[in-house]
Each structure stands twice: as structure tokens, then as C-alpha cells.
Amino acid sequence: MTQLAIGEATPHGATYDGHGVNFTLFSAHAERVELCVFDSRGNERRYDLPGRRGDVWHGYLAGARPGLRYGYRVHGPWQPAQGHRFNPAKLLLDPYARRVEGELKDHPLLHGGHDEPDYRDNAAVAPKSVVISDHYDWEDDAAPRTPWGKTVIYEAHVKGLTYLHPELPQEIRGTYKALGHPVMVAYFKQLGITALELLPVAQFASEPRLQRMGLTNYWGYNPMAMFALHPAWASSPEMALDEFRDAVKALHRAGIEVILDIVLNHSAELDLDGPTFSLRGIDNRSYYWIRDDGDYHNWTGCGNTLNLSHPGVVEYACECLRYWVETCHVDGFRFDLASVMGRTPTFRQDAPLFAAIKACPVLSTVKLIAEPWDIGEGGYQVGNFPPPFAEWNDHFRDAARRFWLPRNLTTGEFACRFAASSDVFKRNGRAPGASVNLLTAHDGFTLRDCVCFNQKHNEANGEENRDGTNSNYSDNHGKEGLGGPLDLMERRRDSIHALLATLLLSQGTPMLLAGDEHGHSQHGNNNAYCQDNALTWLDWQQANRGLTTFTAALIRLRQQIPALTGNSWWEEGDGNVRWLNKNAQPLSADEWQNGPKLMQILLSDRFLIAINATLEVTDIVLPEGEWRAVPPFAGEDNPVITAVWQGPAHGLCVFQRG
């Protein structure tokens, strides 16, 4: 058998140098590693990796070229109680694979064994890693580097955003190409968003349970290959990388940043009954958090948890993030279940991965957004992430809904959330932009569903409506469902307007869910993770154009208010904010805690937000001076107001002085 040259221990993965391919694989506990290459007929040839430096195995295959399909068989102990599950009968994906051929099917041969190893060979059905050659002309591409104070994030799904868009060419709808098409770029600019945050684009798999039910994982939070683009949204798997980069380049030219939702907390190997296709067979003990009995700590709810305190796994995570920044020019990341990143196993602000990111000149300068919780003990860590992380602020989400969709909430609590939750984020040198304010996100009700449904309706998910949260803080305004009489529809519209204004005129970084500006509904499904269909795809032909115009006007207004774009904490007497009651007097202590939901917020001494969140029409006395409503609140007849605004129930209006 032909032997490999020793090669080099870096760079990690499979690297083509024009004459052959260097292969590396991290495994601290392996005893032997075989590189397996496959020809066009599926015939397999095996080579031992001859080199080892520390915990990295390596070898060089002369004459190998891009397009070569490969995998690994890793030999070592089968000691489940100690966390070791080596099984050379199972072909394994390279964790650094830039492209993967084949899907992860629900197949018995992909199971590595539970108490005893499954020695049936799986090469015939296992996904294969593919060597690529990477050459791309970025031309004059430059990162927009939008300041946090001016950032407006738009969370979207690659397919769902454009699949039903009638103005896009049919063949590119629902693809990476569509993201950078002039029609979409023009829409983003007209709306005013500055950053497109994409649900996971790294290759993912549908869980076996979903496959057996005839469903698919739509959102993508079941990662299979962290360095490879999901191929389903490309014209061909070979073109995925370039088509994604074309979209990034087009968006950058328009000044729009691209943020990736990334899943550095678990893998699609799931629990011990899940498939063995990569990390479990390469070095289970190193890659995952293992309990004393050899099973997994399941702090993710997905069966396993990556051990991001292990030096080898920290290096893997950082190289993955750098790859997306350096190779694909993305501008930042939103980290799913990000508390896992700080587990040692307890959460620490100086956890190894946080320290590595902060020390990295590439990663420390891009936008980093944490979903600051996981499901393990001590997993809720809102406000506790170290700089330079921003965080999703669920306090804002819940407070905004409770304020406008009648629940008990004090004026003081609302004001605190409006002011970037300074009680949570004003620490460790962090600025207001660290609070990523949201009303809705991919998981949960859409904004329209928040005003149409009191209960979740997740029957289509096949779990008898048990999945999804029951804490929605929603209000159907008297009738469950989308329809209703005119007066009910008007009340729902007013609530949506008030919620959007609260989001887009609050201090902090606003995040808008794609489709909320259209009036998109998921018909009460608040956990549509497995609905790759019209329930989740945005219907552009049915979009509420008036709501889109209203949203765009709010974003333009936001960018005109220095108190919101300055990204500095508001201080007493600094001219940024004054909190007034309905009589234009400073709020009293009793009004902060017990008063009705009536207030005025004066920003930058010239923009006044008048709020009536009560159930009655109420006169609100404006501060001294001349005030005129500003778009989107100004009507055709927009007189100067010098005394009183008659605030409608659940109403909000913004005025400008002079």
C-alpha cells in the first residue's frame, strides 16, 4: 500500500497546495488514524496518517486534487464509561471539511453502538468530506463596520426570505444568490436595516425523529459540518461558497453587514442513540462534556454539549469563526445557546473561549452577539457576557409585550428597558449597544401572531402541541385567529405600531424579525423549526405595504435622534432624555411605580414620544413649545400642536420641536 508523506500539523483540515493535499486531524485519545479516500465508483483506499505533533495527526498525499472525497477511521479504546467511543468501522467526517457530499440519513449503519460497538461498516451510506481549492476575487470588498449606535439588525432565513418573491428570477429564489440580487438589496436599503443576520448557513442535518415523521429541520440548529455551507441553497454544492460570497460582496457594496447565526454548542450526533459521523468517533472525550457515567451533559436540549473549555475544541471553534470572517468576509456572529461557550463547566466570564476570542485580532473586532442562556443549571446569563459581546435582551422583549399587550408592568420597568436595560448591561465598560432589543425572533410568535393568538398552535410539528413556550405575553384582542371585525383589526394594528415604535425608538441595538414589517403570520405556531413550507416562507404578494412603509419610516426617524445613535449611557441632565408624565412634569416616585401607563419621553431635547398605553382616550399635555408630528405619525393635515395631544387608547405618537 502506498504510504503518505508525514506532511505538516498545520493548517488544520485538508489543504491543497497545487501538488497534493495535506491532511490533519485532532484526536487526543486516538491510537491510530486512517485516511480513507474514495474514487468515483465509491471504491475506498486507506492510508495511515504517519505524523503526530501533540494531539494532531497528519499526513500528505502527493497527487491528490480538489474534488477528492475522503473521511477518517479512528482507532482507540471502546470504553463508554470513560467517554471513549472509538469505532473504526465508522467512516467519519473531517470537522474542518469545507464541503460535504451526501446527507445525514436516518440509517442504522450510522449508529456507532451504545453499550457495545456496532462493527457494521457504514462507508456506503456515510457522508464524505470533499477537498476544495479556494480562489475568489473579492475585488474592492470592504467591511461596512457600522457603529453599534447606528446598527439595525434584520433576522432572516436564507430560503424563507426569498422563496416566494415574485420579482426574483425563479431559479434563484430561496438561495444564496437571491440575498445579493438587486431586488433584495434595494429592499434592504429602502427598509433601512444595516445588518442581515442569517439563521445557520453551516451544513446541518434533519434529526432522525423528524425524518421518520416526514419533516425536515428548517431552521438549521443541528450542525453537521461547521466549515461547510449548507448546499441546498446553492445552484450546486460546488458553487455554494462562491455564491454565498457573491451575496456578501453585493451586500457590502450597499453598506449592509452580514451576521451569521452559528451553533457552537452541540452537534447533530445528538445523544447516545444518535448517529456517529464525526466528533464522537474522533475524540468523544475531548469534544463533548461527559458525565461521570460516560453519558453526555445535555445543557443544550439536543443530546450533547460541546466542551468549549478543552484547548483543542477552543482552537477548533476559533478557527471556525476565523474561517467565516477571513474566507467569507462576514461581519459578525450571533451565538446560539451561548452560555455553553462560557462553561468550565460553570459559567465564567474568563472562560477559555472568551479569552481566546478577546485575544484574537480578527474575532475581537467583529460584531459578537450572544443568546445568553442554555438549559443547564446556571445557564441563564443575561448581562454577564464579557466585552466585546452584545446579548439578546429578553427583558426588553417581555417588558414591551407586557406594557402594550395588557399585563402588569410599571412605568419604571418599561423605562428601564427603553433605556437599554442599564441595570443589566451597564457594567464592565459595556455600552448601550450591548443590549440587542427584540420583540420577536425565529423562535416564538411573529409580531402579527402576538396580537392575534393567546395560545400557541403547534400541532403541525407532530408533538401534540407540547413543544414551544407557553409564556408568550400575547393578546388576541378578543378573538383567537387572524380574522375579525374592523374595530378589532384596528386595535391589533395600533398594538403592532406601538410595539414597533418601542423597538425602533429605544436605546440599544434593535433587531427586527424578517416578515414582521409585512404582517407575516405563522398561524400561531411559535416553534416552526420543522416547517419548510408556506407557514414560514414570506409571502411577498400578501405583504402589508402600509406596515412596511411605517417600519421604514421608524428606522429613518431613529437615525435622526442623537440620543439613540450615540451609543452612550444616558445621564441625568445630559440632554439625552427626560421622563415626563401626562402633564409634562417629571414623573413622581409614585408614578414610576404605580402610575397609569401614561408618559412622555423627550429625546435629544427635540423629539418627544407621547405614550398612552391605557384602555381610554387620554389628553396628554405636551411640554412648552411648538410640536409637530413626524413620519410615520404625521397625517396629511399635520398642524402644529402647542398644548394637548388627545392620545388614543394604546396609542403612541412622536413629535419634533419647532
Curated annotation (Swiss-Prot):
Name the record gives this protein: Glycogen debranching enzyme
Region (Disordered) residue spans: 459-484
**Top-level division of the source organism's lineage:** Bacteria
Q: NCBIfam families under this entry?
A: glgX_debranch, PRK03705.1
Q: In which pathway does it act?
A: Glycan degradation; glycogen degradation
Entry's CDD domains?
A: AmyAc_Glg_debranch, E_set_GDE_Isoamylase_N
Q: Name one Pfam family in it.
A: CBM_48
The molecular function GO annotations come to: glycogen debranching enzyme activity; hydrolase activity, hydrolyzing O-glycosyl compounds
GO biological-process terms attached to the record = glycogen catabolic process
Q: Where is this site: Transition state stabilizer?
A: 443
Stored HAMAP family: GlgX
Provide the active-site residues from the annotation: 336 (nucleophile), 371 (proton donor)
The gene behind this protein is glgX
Instruction: Keywords in alphabetical order, please.
Output: Carbohydrate metabolism, Glycogen metabolism, Glycosidase, Hydrolase
Q: Which family does it belong to?
A: Belongs to the glycosyl hydrolase 13 family.
List the catalytic activities from the record: Hydrolysis of (1->6)-alpha-D-glucosidic linkages to branches with degrees of polymerization of three or four glucose residues in limit dextrin
Q: Which InterPro entries match?
A: GlgX_C (IPR040784), GlgX_Isoamylase_N_E_set (IPR044505), Glyco_hydro_13_cat_dom (IPR006047), Glyco_hydro_13_N (IPR004193), Glyco_hydro_b (IPR013780), Glycogen_debranch_bac (IPR022844), Glycogen_debranch_GlgX (IPR011837), Glycoside_hydrolase_SF (IPR017853)
Summary of the function given for this chain in its UniProt record: Removes maltotriose and maltotetraose chains that are attached by 1,6-alpha-linkage to the limit dextrin main chain, generating a debranched limit dextrin.
EC number of this enzyme: 3.2.1.196
